[in-house]
Amino acid sequence: MNPSTNDFDYRSILGAERRTSLTFSQFLERFLEAPNQTLKTSATMILEAVKHFGVEAVIRSGEPCLRYHIFQDPFSNGINSVFGQEFCIKRIIDVIESVDKESGPRRGIVLVGPPASGKTNMVDLLARALEEYSQETKQKQYSFFFRLANGHGRELELRSPLMPNPILLFPTTLTRPDGSVSRPRQEILDEVQRRHGHDPDFSIPSYYQHATLDKRSLDILETLRQHPRNEGKTLFEIIEEYVRVEEVEYSSARGKGISNIDDMRQLQVQVRPISLAEDDMRLLNDHLQGKYMFRYEGALLSSNRGLLHIHDAFSGDGDRASEMEYKPLLMLLGSGKTSMEFTQASLDTTVFLTTNLEEMNRLDQQLTSSKLLDRIEKVPVNYLLDAASEMDILKRDITNVRERYQVDPNLVRIAAYYSVMTRLFPPQRSSFPPDWSAEKADLYLSIPPEKKLFIYASRSEDPVQTIAQLPPWHPFRNECARLGIDLRDEDVVNQLVVRHPEATSLEESSLFTNEELAIIDDDFMRELYHERYPKEGRYGLSIRQIQNIMRNTIANSDGNKVTVSIFLSQLEKVLQEGPHVHHWLNLDAPQRSSDRLHPRTIGNVILEEGAGNYGDYAGLIQVVKGIYHETLRQEITVSTVDRDPERIEKDLRKYLQHALLDKALENKAFAHVIVPRYTYIDPETGEKVDKPDYEFLRSLEAILLQDATSGEGRKKLAQKFLDLQSEGEINIEESKPVILSRNDNLLAGFNTEYTKLLSHRKTVEGVSPEELRDAFFLRQNNPEQYEKQSAVVRDQVDVIQRNLGDRFDYPEDIALDTVVYALRKEIIDFASIIA
């Protein structure tokens, strides 16, 4: 491309300049004007960085929680995103908040959990957020360096690896010429308190009241004070002449405010001599006569004012971590200091440690570890229990695969369902809330793995209402209040809440009866989740292991199509190979089976009593097969019947409107009051409708109801609508009848009825079920013979394949294979779909 026509300016992208430095007096002017900007601790900086990138809310198991955007990795296009760990992240934020507010002793935050649960990614994203946030022009943090000059243009800059705050140049005590002792640090802090103490958000962290500089910085200051050329100068004048204040930018790569280590021995501070050129050494000796200079190195120093991440913290040499190795950590978490050159320096570091369950258990059992255990806060980071979030990870992993292969649209879903079910524990509680009925308690205890799976991943039909019904003391309310989010404003809440596109309602899963759906509420879901926390998710199939199985699925494909059936075969192969090949099959997991599982049928898979139990990896393959088969039955049925979803929705709304009119007319005494509530103007004819269309009602009841003659089914559906509306489960647009409302969640409450109408048998002229079945087999196995079939049969095959692609995202070849698979496994029978 001709450079003259190229709009891309490659020079400008590397055009950043070094930030200017300030004199000490210039810094103090800024400090006195806005001390809050300077008096930030590491915890404050991390919290501000997290909040700076934004937040949204999700509902998990009936519980609202905040999802901070930094954990979606906005820095690298989501490559290192952490999905579904909102409860864990809240614990982390709570601990940092307590440190920031100095509401308790300093604690190291230990993220503990099984391998590949996202622990390291969480800390890495916190570090990256801190790094990016510190580069924002409005968020200036300052450090200082000594600048020595010879008057001929040569300068030498001496920096401390601690990036100390310039406020620490004010000594805590100072002897005046008359022998009296003053407290310069306290005096400057008292002055800013006098100026800004009226601001409720202003506070002075105790760190800045008591912290001291490192020995080398103090030695330099003292040597400069004693130098003959500085005789008669005050400490302020010396600082003004020799010190420059500069803006701080955190950097993981350069070890500035952020340190990452994988060996506790790297916590030790190293003291090394400075190697300088001859001219620089002459300059140094000119100002610091007789002073042999050293430099300090170490992870603790480089993480000052920021974040220290210790990977695999308690592995140590041999079987356990040595107390000698983590002694520097004990000092840091105990006194906020580190030892260097036979003295101590104050540090302000937020410490994160990541470790697995085995290493943490070994530390717990060490007799000498109690001092460390008292100074850490454990945060469990387990495998995901939300299948929708598990899908997010798997989708990210196969992004490139989709460019080279045709991928079954159900592959990621079924893989996520299986992996999550292997991690679940059965409900076993012995006592229940006093307002629970016996039926509710019995349902709770008999929940099988597949139902628990869908409860954990269910879509909240009205998240705004879920949040509105939270008690005043709920932690979510407090968390939002700290962020300035007004939960009383419905528009604010609507914008805050996000809905996962892969989440399904319990009704859509086809696993729950109407009676069960009526019992399961937000309270039920919350109790189910919290009973097994934090054990649930520690065991089972890890995301790395499911990724390996997915890779084997791709490797065993035909080089073009990656299907669910291949994935299920790979799962069965893994179980056949056993724990000698796949170590996770032999992990020492606690007993997880339930003795309350009744015989059940999922799709076309029949499970006897106790089959498909918690922790039964082989049985759970049959469970996930049943879910997959039921999914195929619904998808192929809808694609075959080929009805317009919008038309079906309108028919359902019309049915409910007329059923309500019929119910209103039954109440003779109050009909004159109730009927007008359900009267409406027909948008197609413009006529007022105040009487039910009984012929229309009966036509739909022939599809919806087993007994369409007694009228009882119609009454139940009308009452169901009224109950859901009064309980806030469905919300019809204000001042609109149900038939005219559109911006609502009606289908969430009537998904079963909607699906029945959508998949009702269709009459196809000139095509028999047998001909259609044979045509699919011929198209796959004998294309020449297929072309000899009648045009109307081939057209119907095309319609089904096209609908599978348009409605459910099937690639053309996989759509054909899927229908043939469903016919072979007797998942579908065209005789029950078309007439």
Residue ranges and their predicted role:
Residues 1-43:
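Long, basic/Gly/Ser/Thr-rich N-terminal segments
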Residues 28-835:
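Conserved ASCE/P-loop NTPase catalytic core
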